[in-house]
Regions:
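Bacterial N-terminal signal peptides that target proteins for export
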Residues: 2-12
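General marker for long, soluble alpha-helical cores
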Residues: 22-345
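Bacterial N-terminal signal peptides
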Residues: 12-23
Length: 345
């Protein structure tokens, strides 16, 4: 037998060994463990699925209506009984087997992908979806209608991660259309998700527009929601004497705790025409109504906002002002600040 002929069986054995040791990822089963709790409301359950694969460990927990499952009924008894039920989604079917009692249960699950769904997704531009991808789509109920709806709304070729994020956070086709009708079209998936996460809804936009805020960016809207610059806050500030401000100013006031009560307190002491910048600067540097009241009681009733801020920046305390006033009844704010700058006490 030639050397070449003898080498062929060895090569075949090597290939077979490699195949046995390193199975193809596509052949790996999608399965794992599940834990279910029946919620106080009879029609909902909390389901947690846990998997360990070559990707690592993953866990997903969601509240579902019991109608999302086929064959799931709540046992009357607190004693475990065998259970088998399914979650049928466009992307495939999850089959759950294990034990259930009146409070919940646990067991193993497996997932069978739907090849027809994968083919439809390929036609929509989402090709090369793995079984792992399809499992994720099933868990989060990313169905044909959702993907087609986003495509029709102007998002035909979203990445898989964008699809999942938009589904999880409720950036639905209807949400996208509603925003587009208000002038917010062509937003990025990240912008849409951020708006949903922080509650920058069409209703929120409408309330702001009623107050004169017509051309806010998506970033403005998200920042206002994050920091609590709500329509109610803006109305309160207007009633206190600070009229329409920019989105940035509204956010700055919220960050630095400029409240309607703060502004009203200052107005009562003669500061009738505060700007949002004035109010923010006073809050940043600790010019409180109490500080202003004490300074005025020492005779500095005409101190401007800039004077008050300068006094706080340079450490002109009420005790220092009182002591200097006792020495020189005619001392001015500028002189007090200069004394502190140069270390005189």
């Amino acid at each position: 037998m030639s050397e070449k002929s003898r080498s062929r069986p060895a090569l075949a054995l090597a290939i077979l060994a490699a195949t046995l040791v390193f199975p193809r990822v596509a052949d790996a089963a999608i399965d794992g463990r599940w834990i279910l709790e029946f919620e106080p409301k009879e029609d909902r359950v909390q389901l947690t699925t846990k998997r360990t694969s070559w990707h690592g460990h993953s866990e997903n927990s969601c509240s579902y209506p019991t109608s999302a499952f086929r064959g799931l009924t709540r046992p009357k008894s607190s004693t475990d009984s065998p259970a088998r039920f399914e979650m049928v989604r466009d992307a495939g079917t999850l089959t759950f087997e294990g034990q259930l009692d009146s409070g919940g249960g646990s067991g193993r699950f497996s997932f069978q992908a739907d090849s027809a769904f994968a083919a439809d997704m390929a036609k929509l531009g989402h090709d090369h979806l793995s079984d792992e991808n399809l499992y994720t789509m099933a868990v989060h109920d990313i169905d044909r209608a959702f993907v087609r709806g986003l495509a029709d709304a102007g998002y035909p070729r979203l990445s898989f991660d964008d699809l999942v994020a938009m589904r999880i956070h409720g950036a639905t086709p209807q949400f996208v259309r509603d925003l587009a009708s208000l002038g917010y079209s062509h937003l990025s998936p990240d912008d849409l998700v951020a708006m949903r996460i922080h509650g920058a809804t069409p209703e929120f936009i409408g309330e702001l527009r009623a107050l004169g805020y017509e051309r806010l960016s998506s970033d403005d809207l998200v920042a206002m929601r994050i920091h609590g610059a709500t329509p109610e806050f803006l109305k309160g500030m207007a009633a206190a004497g600070i009229g329409k401000v920019s989105a940035d100013d509204a956010v700055a006031m919220r960050i630095h705790e400029v409240t309607p009560e703060f502004v009203r307190s200052l107005r009562e002491m003669g500061y009738d025409h505060l700007s949002s910048d004035d109010a923010v600067s006073m809050r940043i540097h600790g010019v409180t109504p109490e500080f202003v009241r004490q300074i005025q009681a020492l005779g500095f009733r005409d101190a401007s906002v800039d004077d008050l801020v300068s006094m706080r920046i340079h450490g002109v305390t009420t005790d220092f002002a009182r002591k200097m006033k006792a020495r020189d009844p005619g001392v001015t704010v500028d002189e007090l600040v200069s004394m502190r700058i140069h270390g005189r006490d």
